[in-house]
Amino acid sequence: MNGHGKSWDIWLTLGRCLVVAVTIVAAPPLLPGQESLSTPQSKVERKNKAPVSREILRVKLPKPVEAKLKNGLTVLILEDHPAPFVNVQLHIGGAGALFEPANMAGLASTTAHMLREGSQTRTSIQIAEEIDRLGAALSAGASFGSPDAVLSASGLSDNFDQWFSVATDVLLHPSFPVEELEKMKQRQRVQLREQRSAPGFLLDERFHRAVYGEHPAANVAPTLASLDAISQAALIQWHRERYAPQDAILGIAGDVRAKNLIAKLEKQLAGWKKTEVTETWPRNPTAATERKVFLVDRPNSVQTTLALGNIAIDRLNPDYPSMVVMNHVIGGGASSRLFLNLREEKGYTYGVYSDFSALRYAGPWRAGGNLRTEVTQGALTEFFNEIRRIQDEKVPAAELEASKRSIVASFALSLEQPARVLSFAIAIKLYGLPADYWDAYPAKIMAVSADDVQRVARKYLNPDSLQVVAVGDADKIKPILEQYGKVEVFDANGVPLGAKP
């Protein structure tokens, strides 16, 4: 405790005798639905030295004050008074792209982005100027594949009531002006055309379609046709039917008083009425049972952009901690096997990685990177070699220990960000995790054994059923890819090219 009230000091055991308090400071919000599940790199990780001793790191995250408003809105409040700053995250279940009509890809994200473009009493310019004058930040989005729309805001606690009032206004009373909608759609059209020349986008698009098939998560962007179908009336209807308080979670962290704030929220959000939302969840994605190879042709490209992977687990799968450790060993950081092999030893690439998505439905594990065209053959060989190696050989004790300690150290560093701690609290609600999940997280990671790593590698990284996706010069790399299976070739617009020689 300190003179300003409750402290978020978290005591971390970093050695046998050394105890350090990590004080949480303000940072931009990181949203649970948008975060990558691979372990963040740190300076310590790049040096392959994790600053956590063999003692298991023990943390006890602050528990939020929780309330349910009369309209059904769940509110989570984390008080932190030393810094005069407040972070707000609002997750609106059922308003995400996962539920949008098949012919209107981008409806959810466009609706969310348009919240800032005008309310019943403010123009887009007035909203922007008022937020800037208050020194605040306000944004909204709905990621492809996500079941939620997310509104984020932050600013000083001294003028919290003012900037939160603007956020409430755009949430409850958007006008979706036609002229602003047309401007946004035109910007999206330009962006789509530009993305057709970006190998990273082409890879993501084809990889998602390869692993997700007919699942809505296969979409990574709107199409020109779907943008044409999105109208002001469609936005109004989506907002009216999907933005419901009983399916939403409002998280607030910072220099606020929970008791006083809950009473304010009850009044300020009283106009947000319940709406019956029908959430028809698509069937859970399943892993492919046979290997397929896909190639997006970029004539004269000097590099191959490569990914290989398959559907793995959802967030509640008990294999999650083992997957975190396995992924870290094979490709989760600069000390990983793929990085040391393909970059440090072979010099094939400046960066190579692996990660996995585990949300409320099963997502893919994937590995990949950008490679010089002439080393495509060697790189593919090494990708499969490393996958077979982690399946056939148990990870040595020292390597396993270093990986687990690095994961725990990165987790500890993330607790310095109040927005991140708020995201952890929201994640417990979103995924139905135990209340003490994050307190026990370091111990769960440290409990992962070499047998566990080998088991999940064998279970989810079957080389014979991985989906292989490459973007590059088909004339040069198609013969190489054919060694791994029949190659389906597409142009940059996604049109099949048939039996291109």
Question: Model-derived features: where do they sit?
Answer:
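N-terminal secretory signal peptides that target proteins for export/translocation
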Residues: 1-13
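His/Glu-rich zincin catalytic helix
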Residues: 33-130, 152-155, 165-167, 236-341, ...
